[in-house]
Amino acid sequence: ITLLAAIPAGSGLGTSSILASTVLGAINDFCGLAWDRNDICSYTLALEQLLTTGGGWQDQYGGVFPGVKLLQSEAGFEQNPLVRWLPDQLFTHPDYRDCHLLYYTGITRTAKGILAEIVSSMFLNSGPHLSLLAEMKVHATDMSEAILRGNFENFASLINKTWAQNQALDSGTNPP
């Protein structure tokens, strides 16, 4: 198998997870294994953990399941996220589609380093981190509600809140 990815490692775009799920999907098709999309995503998590990349927790769902979605899962070792599809009009309607920008800074960091810091804080029962993670869970639901309602103003406000939460969770969100 030969792969070419023109996206640099550590870009934050989930490339390793998406590539791993693509390879597993190709093996599934070639061998007639009859895996569904959830199986491929679960096997991607296992593969990424075996390779010690630290990724594979959610990125592959973005690539394997099309469209705008909210992923929800319960606490515990075995993750079986529920995929809830959302309308895409805030991203495709002519009044809104030009209001979105994905900007790549060229600064790279690997998921392994980022997740090590976050998981360490969870295992140490860091009150501020656990509280922030709970807030982020509620925030994701608020964001999906804004998208469902087509409320662009609320959506934009929540994007700002997402940025603030990411900065609080990960000290490297704004590297020097």
Regions found by a protein language model. Name each.
Residues 10-21, 55-69:
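FAD-binding core of FAD-dependent oxidoreductases
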Residues 42-52, 60-176:
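C-terminal nucleotide
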Residues 1-46:
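Anion-binding (especially nucleotide phosphate/pyrophosphate-binding) glycine-rich loop
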Residues 29-33, 53, 164:
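A generic secondary-structure boundary signal that marks alpha-helix termini
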